Amino acid sequence: MYCGHFGFSEKPFDMTPDPKYLYLNRNNKEVFAALKYGIRDRRGFISIIGEVGTGKTTLLNAALDQLDENTKAAYIFNTSVTFDKILATTLFELGLKKSDESLSKIHAIDRLNNFAIEQLTAGGNVALIIDEAQNLDMKSLENLRLLSNLETRKHKLIQIVIAGQPELDAILQRQELRQLTQRINLNR
């Protein structure tokens, strides 16, 4: 009813985060710029923390839409799974694994590492973007830290973005994750 009244061609307040409706207030503009910069300039680990409904998912989707053509990205939104499943989904999204193919964790990481080196050599980049990261278990967070070890002497091979609600910030402050927290180069 309101669409006709206001002359809208579609509902602007849908329940799914459509990046074309992204509103960049001052804070979101800063976070969006930092996110794009962090991926482009190979900052390694990036975290985005915000309350429910503040636009984190929409920002992530908009950033994915605006990545340059040389950046390959995997977007993970189901975080109530094991790290092995996150790794398998990452490989699948990057076109490195068939959906029914089974790989050990070592072989999966090796395949991802080789792909990231190929991308770097060709002038490309690789990003792993994880939404709802507050649902990740401690083991998955520690494995993400280990994944961030994929690097050359000069470059991080995989740019890892974790986005989540304020609970994620509390989780990252835990003593057992101090090594991960030290690797976060951009924290918004």
Where are these regions (language model features)?
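A short, basic N-terminal segment
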Residues: M1-R42
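Walker A/P-loop nucleotide-binding motif
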Residues: D41-A62, T79
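Conserved NTP-binding/hydrolysis module of P-loop NTPases
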Residues: F8-F13, K72, T82-D100
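Residues immediately C-terminal
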Residues: T54, E132-M138, L146, E167-L168
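Mid-core helix/loop region of P-loop NTP-binding domains shared across ATPases and GTPases
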Residues: T82-K85, K97-N143, T152-H155
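Structural recognition of the conserved hydrophobic beta-strand(s) that form the central parallel beta-sheet
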Residues: I49, A127-D131, I158-Q165
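A short helix-turn-beta junction within AAA+ P-loop NTPase domains corresponding to the substrate/partner-engaging
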Residues: E69-K72, Q175-R188
